[in-house]
């Protein structure tokens, strides 16, 4: 049965992380037939520590920076005895409990990767698996994540010591022993905050530097005695005013970054993806972490910085982000350019209305239950309950949405997919309602 834009057909889900299995649950609820392929031996994706597929970026000490109050699935509450910020093992167990509670495990095909996905002339998708088999689907749902294809900047010179991207960092001792070493972390995101705080402890690194090309605002995990993300501004408050009030509260709470010896940010709080840490600023203030500016070049057993200074370095951890990649597509239309991949409601590329990207965003405060919301529109479309607007309108909405969600962020690869979770979901539900009206009008 070829894709005709209306008939249910069969769906293929690529990946069984939190985006993939919440989509599977939604399709199961609708009674829509689907296959879900996971290249690893179990669910969890990025939150599966030491995932045998090599694509997890979990390190042993990792706790999620989103509080339990904001990451719970709608119909499956988190355990009452959880701490405010659960460890990755607790989050993974929550995922397992969800999958087993809703009977999803038997619907997932493990140890099977999607090698290629090609759109046919009739609109269907030919999906070739690592088993060598090719199957045809009317709907394709991509949930392969965007925190696995590590990006390492290219600097002149050579470095003779140990190098690792934060994606492959696991703990201070294995696979590399950082004890007694002069270590440099490169980057200013959450992984950089966590790993520098961990390795800077005196029994571990002899000396730890952090190199940032630009200053960032490091936000606390707690404000006024509660998780910072638990405080939600009233929904009636205009977005710009809410952002202004939040900025004022942040500055009052943490002061100026340069007062800690860090580079002065060239932007306001919340004009960049927040770096969140309850420990980093204290370790900088205690002299355990030594801030440095941008790298000029690598220099054998050391690094030369833009200000002309040089530091002897034994090991570098590159906490420099990720590329957005879809290795199973072979058409330029479906490749991200400079990490930019504009989509209608962060889900659909106009002209490919039977292809959905789930979880392909950097939502504040969390990605964990983001696709659970997206799956509502996706399933409604497959079930014939929702219709997209005309292509021209979809293109216009993409531009408007990107201006709304990205307009206040400084230009950087990490800011190509930012969305405000609450504003996004509110707008998505409005679009879902409008699309249902369109579907009824043409029925």
Question: Positions of the model-derived regions?
Answer:
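Short, mixed-charge aromatic SLiMs
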Residues: 396-409
């Amino acid at each position: 049965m070829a894709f005709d834009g209306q008939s249910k057909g069969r769906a293929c889900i690529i990946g069984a992380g939190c985006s993939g299995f919440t989509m599977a649950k939604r399709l199961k609820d609708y009674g829509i037939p689907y296959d879900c392929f996971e290249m690893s031996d179990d669910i969890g994706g990025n939150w599966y520590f030491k995932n045998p597929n090599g694509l997890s970026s979990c390190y042993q000490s990792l706790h999620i920076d989103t509080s339990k109050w904001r990451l719970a699935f709608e119909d499956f509450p988190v355990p009452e005895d959880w701490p405010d910020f659960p460890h990755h093992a607790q989050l993974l167990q929550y995922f397992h409990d969800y999958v087993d509670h809703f009977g999803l495990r038997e619907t997932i095909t493990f140890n099977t990767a999607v090698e290629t996905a090609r759109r046919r002339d009739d609109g269907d998708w030919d999906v070739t698996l690592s088993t060598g088999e090719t199957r045809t689907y009317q709907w394709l749902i991509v949930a392969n994540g965007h925190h696995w294809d590590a990006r390492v900047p290219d600097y002149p010179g050579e470095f003779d010591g140990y190098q690792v991207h934060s994606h492959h960092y696991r703990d201070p001792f294995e696979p590399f022993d950082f004890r007694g070493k002069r270590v440099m972390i490169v980057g200013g995101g959450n992984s950089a905050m966590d790993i520098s705080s961990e390795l800077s402890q005196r029994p571990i690194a002899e000396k730890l530097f952090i190199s940032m090309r630009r200053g960032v605002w490091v936000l606390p995990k707690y404000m006024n005695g509660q998780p910072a993300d638990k405080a939600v501004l009233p929904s009636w408050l205009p977005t710009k005013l809410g952002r202004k009030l939040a900025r004022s509260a942040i500055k009052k709470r943490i002061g100026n970054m340069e007062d800690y010896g860090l580079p002065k940010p060239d932007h306001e709080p919340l004009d960049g993806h927040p770096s969140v840490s309850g420990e980093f600023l204290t370790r900088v203030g205690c002299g355990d972490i030594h801030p440095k500016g941008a790298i000029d070049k690598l220099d054998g057993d050391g690094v030369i910085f833009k200000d002309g200074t040089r530091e002897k370095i034994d090991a570098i951890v590159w906490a420099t982000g990720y590329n957005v990649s879809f290795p199973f597509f072979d058409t330029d239309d479906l490749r991200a350019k400079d990490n930019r991949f504009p989509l209608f409601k962060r889900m659909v590329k106009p002209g490919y209305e039977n292809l959905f990207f789930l979880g392909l965003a950097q939502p504040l405060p969390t990605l964990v239950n983001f696709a659970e919301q997206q799956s509502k529109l996706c399933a409604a479309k497959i079930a014939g309950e929702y219709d997209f607007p005309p292509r021209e309108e979809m293109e216009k909405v993409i531009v408007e949405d990107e201006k709304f969600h990205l307009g206040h962020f400084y230009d950087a690869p990490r800011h190509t997919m930012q969305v405000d979770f609450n504003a996004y979901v509110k707008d998505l539900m409005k679009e879902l309602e409008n699309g249902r009206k369109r579907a009824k009008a043409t029925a």
